Swiss-Prot record:
Its main location: cytoplasm. Keywords: Cytoplasm, GTP-binding, Hydrolase, Metal-binding, Nucleotide-binding, Ribosome biogenesis, RNA-binding, rRNA-binding, Zinc. GTP binds at T135, K136, I137, D138, G187, P188, S189, G190, V191, G192, K193, T194, S195. PANTHER family: SMALL RIBOSOMAL SUBUNIT BIOGENESIS GTPASE RSGA, SMALL RIBOSOMAL SUBUNIT BIOGENESIS GTPASE RSGA 1, MITOCHONDRIAL-RELATED. One of its GO terms (biological process) is ribosomal small subunit biogenesis. Binds 1 zinc ion per subunit. GO terms for molecular function: GTP binding; GTPase activity; metal ion binding; rRNA binding. Zn(2+) binds at C270, C275, H277, C283. NCBIfam families: ribosome small subunit-dependent GTPase A. Belongs to the TRAFAC class YlqF/YawG GTPase family. RsgA subfamily. The keyword Cytoplasm applies. This is Small ribosomal subunit biogenesis GTPase RsgA.
């Protein structure tokens, strides 16, 4: 059996399957003879050392781990340790995320401002850069597309419009995704996340489904998180769709999760340090901003929620 017991290698968890971890390792520069038959990367089916469970260390997709006792013939190994995370997205659970790309459909299903904002706030809460991917732009007019782009710009976000039917915007999206290490593709069901991955990485061929005509929203096809290589050492995570992300935040911090509010608060200060930007005198937040009613509604939910600092 071709097994390496003495050398520990680093790898990244690309999927969780039952009680196993799928770990990808890169050994192209390793000089040991046992690697001669391999080129580039290989995925190993791994179990974890029991000490990790005793220590209360959870392992999720995206975690950087140490693997040992590698059986190259059967592609199996043991995960012995996990490195500290640089970031963590709670839902979907992915570690070391550098970009959250939120897929929003221009049509079918219809755009939902509250839903979109909740996904953006999920990234903001985790202090991870968000990017909006506007899908299905072949279903709308050029004027409507301009309105979408201007809307997201007023919120403080970049937007890459794409269509898998005519490949519009695909090259720009690939270029952007290859500039970051690990991108999570998130968004509600039915917006075309899985179809987009199939278009970006044709060798993947993930199952897809159409939008329900009765419910007017998508159905879930992705059941678990998995990482896929998109070139230049970058990884892309497909995630299960869900339609109402929860917001967990201190009420006093909530306004700082909105880029358009942050801009105003950085230019001038409210009269009172504990201003929640409701009806306090001397508040500098423009109450006519598009997302201000959404902010107020969810702020009240946070304040009145029986659970600590949660809206949703």
């Amino acid at each position: 059996m071709n097994k390496n017991k003495s050398n520990k290698l680093k790898g990244i968890v690309v999927a969780l399957k039952a009680n196993f971890l799928i770990v990808e390792i890169d050994h192209k520069n390793f000089k040991d003879y046992s690697f001669d038959e391999f080129n580039g990367k290989i995925r190993l089916l791994c179990i974890r050392r029991s000490k990790l469970n005793y220590q209360g260390l959870f392992i999720d997709v995206g975690d950087i781990v140490g693997v040992e006792s590698i059986d190259y013939k059967n592609k199996r190994a043991v995960v012995s340790d996990v490195e500290p995370r640089q970031s963590f997205l709670k839902r979907p659970a992915v570690a070391n995320v550098t970009l959250v790309s939120i897929c929003i459909s221009a049509d079918e299903p219809l755009f939902d401002m509250e839903q979109t904002s909740r996904f953006l706030l999920t990234a903001e809460c985790a202090n991870i850069e968000p990017l909006i991917i506007l899908t299905k732009i072949d279903l709308i007019t050029k004027n409507d597309l301009i309105l979408y782009i201007n809307k997201f710009k007023s919120w403080g976000y970049d937007c890459i419009p794409v269509s898998i039917h005519n490949s519009q915007g695909i090259d720009s999206l690939i270029e952007r995704l290859r500039k970051t290490k690990l991108t999570v593709l998130a968004g509600p069901s039915g917006v075309g996340k899985t179809s987009l991955i199939n278009h970006l990485i044709p060798t993947v061929s993930l199952p897809t489904s159409s939008v329900s005509k009765k419910l007017k929203r998508g159905t879930h096809t992705t059941r678990h998180v998995e990482l896929f290589a998109i070139g230049n050492g970058s990884l892309l995570a497909d995630t299960p769709g869900f339609n109402r992300p929860e917001i967990v935040c201190e009420p006093s911090d909530f306004a700082f999760l909105f880029p358009e509010f942050r801009t105003q608060l950085s230019n001038s200060q409210c009269k009172f340090r504990n201003c929640l930007h409701r009806d306090e005198p001397g508040c500098v937040i423009d109450k006519d901003l598009e997302r201000y009613p959404f902010y107020r509604e969810n702020l009240e939910e946070m304040i009145n929620s029986p659970l600590p600092y949660q809206a949703g």
